[in-house]
Amino acid sequence: MTNTKYYPEVSSNADFAAIEREILKLWQDNNIFQKSIDNRIKDAEFIFYDGPPFANGLPHYGHLLTGFIKDVYARYQTIKGKKVERRFGWDCHGLPAEMQSEQELGISGRLAITNFSIEKFNSHCRASVMKYTGEWEQYVTRQARWVDFKNSYKTMDTHFMESVLWAFKELYNKGLLYESMRVMPYSWACETPLSHFETRLDNSYRERADKAVTVSFMLRDKLPHSEYKEYRIFAWTTTPWTLPANLALAVGSDIDYALVPKNDICYIIAAASVSKYAKELELKGDEQFTIIKGSELEGLRYKPLFNYFENHPNSFKIFACDFVVEGDGTGVVHMAPGFGEDDQILCESKGIELVCPVDNSGKFTKEIPDLEGLQVFDANDKIIIKLKEQGNWLKTEQYIHNYPHCWRTDTPLIYKAVPSWYVKVTNFKDRIVELNQQINWIPSHVKDNVFGKWLENARDWSISRNRFWGTPLPVWKSDDPKYPRIDVYGSIEELEKDFGVKVTDLHRPFIDELTRANPDDPTGKSTMRRIEDVFDCWFESGSMPYSQAHYPFENKKWFEDHFPADFIVEYVAQTRGWFYTLMVLSTALFDRPPFLNCICHGVILDTTGQKLSKRLNNYADPLELFDKYGSDALRITMLSSNVVKGQELLIDKDGKMVFDTLRLFIKPIWNAYHFFTMYANADSLKGKSDFASENVLDIYILSKLKIAVQKIEKSLDNFDTQAAYHQVSEFFEVLNNWYIRRSRARFWKSEKDADKQNAYNTLYSCLETMAIAMSALVPMISEAIYLGLHNTVIPQLDYGISGDKPGAQDPIIKSQDGIRGCRNDNLSVHLCNYPKLSNFEVNHELVATMDTVLDICSNSLFIRSNENVRVRQPLASITIISKHNDKLKDFEDLIKDEINVKAIIYRDDLENYATTKLSLNFPMLGKRLPYKMKEIIAASKKGEWEATASALAICGETLKSEEYKLVLEPYSHIKGAASFADNSSLLILDLELTPELIKEGIARDIVRFIQQARKDADCSITDRILIEIISESDLSKIINIYGDYIKEQTLSEFAKDFTPDYVNEIELENHKIQLKIKR
């Protein structure tokens, strides 16, 4: 008679990567992703915005991390009944694309691009930005992330760009845009200004050594009431290259300045800085100087260092202001309004127009003939030499400071006056701060700290770039200043109406060719021409919510229903990037926050804390890890770590962390599934989802199941994958190491009675329910388990040679409410509804008692380990000292069997066995009560404290729960003791071994030896075997005494004179023992 097998014969050492590949194929062949969306009603949607990546490079670990998080919540909300569209997007414009194209074309700089042809350059950019889309799809698909690539949006699409134009015009009409020549962070390598927030991206500030120089300026005016032949004032700067453009000096009104005489010259320097220049000024240290306030220097004229701008109006005067800091440098700041924000503000207020003798590539112009064509940083030495020759130099020093670098080229930025269009963020930043309070940030401190403080200090946003590949600013100006006019366009229709041509491409140079006569010029000679600038690509990504829908030109209702997003996620630096630009534009255009929940994850570094990079070769290719361990393992490694809480994750190159996840998280899940299929197939029994068993272990594990399912749901509702993974792991720990182990006899027995069926049903219910509950967290392994439980053949899984394969013709057993409930037909776990288990009530009293039983067992193991007593060695007794022993007596036999003792002694006089000690959290208490620590420590040692259920009083202070811990400490004369985690109980194992106990322990070791030999001999779990045990006389006596026990536990019979299939030999208690097996 053939043995009917209803489940796959899965291996305990499964190739999870191979299983995942089969799952991916099954999903694709059956269009499961689309089914998961179509199954859900449109009225219940979960709105998710997918931040667009650049496709001109391969995905890295950071992309995968973000993708895993996105996928978890999209899958989870789907099984919660929501419709979750996952439209992918591509960021196409901006510096990344331009820099790559310049490199590939072998050209560099604006002039070279113009000579090459803007049209050809942009055409190359268009192709390059989609270079790696195939690889992106491969990575994203392999990581089991479901996204809609077919309907992806691209920021270079005409419809997307048109919505960006609309947003610009809306801001213009609201009076929230202006054009100005202002000092901005400037990338001379990219020949473009950057926004202030771009200088904070990707740790763009880094340590840099610069030459700081102190120079003297000769005053043209003398100080009143002071007679010296000559007056000089010292200024200190870390940017010597800005000195040729100096137009003013700034001092602090209330700062004290010393008049330091030397050889008929009076030197002026902040009094607090005199000692720093004692050597240069040849001071002894005991001199007394005349002190004046900075306000007394106001308006004094000085002679310029160089003659380049000596006739510049209103210049070369000393001004008092409030931004000069005492102790910095000399207390005197040189002002070059073309290269400093404060400089520009001060000089403008004094009627000094800025000068900017540096071109777009960071080189001096002909206005500085001595330095023309020289890069500014390369000019420092020449400037210092000239200052020495002129007698203006006092000191040069190396100055190490954090300095902003270009986030694309890694070159040091300069600050330079450039014309740009700005969003008046300062006009409505208070409203942004208000709307930020409506957002749930994860981690929570981002709301008011990282992001909140950034918003409070927000500046106006420069949104124009003098580049080529981007959405052009829709601004046309008259080319004749006699007849000024500005036209701003917000749609293609408006452009076509005014210019009378069909517009099919909004990119340069095509858009630049649109010209028309200036309507405000009666001569008809001037022309309206578009300004050359394109948008900052961050403006485009910040426009993603409406631009992806081509709002407001179409899909108006769709956008209104899909704004704001329920959820977005990126790494924490996007608080200065995408999150910020979304917030600015959403507030300005719609007066609403753009998203309601936002996860800011941390960064992934190597084990030494360095960034992952090809140059350092410090990370493994993710595809290699996927092929070796599977992507579920990498998903769990990342999302169960603190990186989801905004912290760093250090990952090794060799994949050990991922392997450990496979071993410690996935294998226990698979082991439970393997156990079920192995024994169910051996018994030709099917499990079903059934919660009606009255067996106490079944009730307990089903109660733990419902609790775990509820906690996973709560964790994911709170956007906490770390907690959710912990719940999954904790449940399978109990399922494997308690329920299955304590129920083995029910699965092993030959009778196919109701108790055995209940055991199978209970284990089936746990596996099926958890497969659904954890499907977003472990999507492919959950799928394999679910499909296996529902008789779906996965080709990679071997069903064996003998017996029948799972019968697809068998009727599907319908589970109780809440497990399935949408159109599924068992095609996929991802088409199910999240389990509610509403027809099953948790037995909380049983759970509490059984959890105590588990604590007793685990503490007993702890004692055995500490005392070096093996688990198979029986002990005489355990003493349980507790106030709550009554409930344990129902489980006395279970406890004795589990911890291998002959008797349990119950006591309640805890005070005779242990004392409660107070353990303080010194780091935390030290921060809160630094001046009381000595007193508190002394009182804790004397026992001068009082504890209640929720607090502890000591030295007049009430300690918080996290600031202390109460520890139950056994008296020193008591051996073999351990306390419960809650300090409510104490256990004491009797460690004295009698000869009888030792013999029984040896018998148990022999059983273990035979069971291992069965595995090594490839015996199936149902095979009965013949064994012969050859040993020395002492062991033979023990074997004779415990023979029946040995045979029962190992499904064996003793025999002699047979030809063995397997032979092995070990040493036991210093005696050799040989085992022969015949199947």
UniProtKB/Swiss-Prot annotation:
Top-level taxon in the UniProt lineage: Bacteria
Reactions catalysed: tRNA(Ile) + L-isoleucine + ATP = L-isoleucyl-tRNA(Ile) + AMP + diphosphate
Statement: the UniProt record of this protein carries the keyword Ion transport: no
GO biological process, one term: isoleucyl-tRNA aminoacylation
Keywords from the UniProt entry: Aminoacyl-tRNA synthetase, ATP-binding, Cytoplasm, Ligase, Metal-binding, Nucleotide-binding, Protein biosynthesis, Zinc
Motif ('HIGH' region): 53-63
Required cofactor names: Zn(2+)
InterPro entries from the UniProt entry: aa-tRNA-synth_I_CS, aa-tRNA-synth_Ia, Anticodon_Ile_ABEc, Ile-tRNA-ligase, Ile-tRNA-ligase_type2, M/V/L/I-tRNA-synth_anticd-bd, Rossmann-like_a/b/a_fold, tRNAsynth_Ia_anticodon-bd
Residues annotated to bind ATP: 614
Documented EC number(s): 6.1.1.5
Motif position, 'KMSKS' region: 611-615
Record family assignment: Belongs to the class-I aminoacyl-tRNA synthetase family. IleS type 2 subfamily.
Classification via PANTHER family: ISOLEUCINE--TRNA LIGASE, CYTOPLASMIC (PTHR42780:SF1), SOLEUCYL-TRNA SYNTHETASE (PTHR42780)
Role according to the record: Catalyzes the attachment of isoleucine to tRNA(Ile). As IleRS can inadvertently accommodate and process structurally similar amino acids such as valine, to avoid such errors it has two additional distinct tRNA(Ile)-dependent editing activities. One activity is designated as 'pretransfer' editing and involves the hydrolysis of activated Val-AMP. The other activity is designated 'posttransfer' editing and involves deacylation of mischarged Val-tRNA(Ile).
Protein name per Swiss-Prot or TrEMBL: Isoleucine--tRNA ligase
Organism for this UniProt entry: Rickettsia canadensis (strain McKiel)
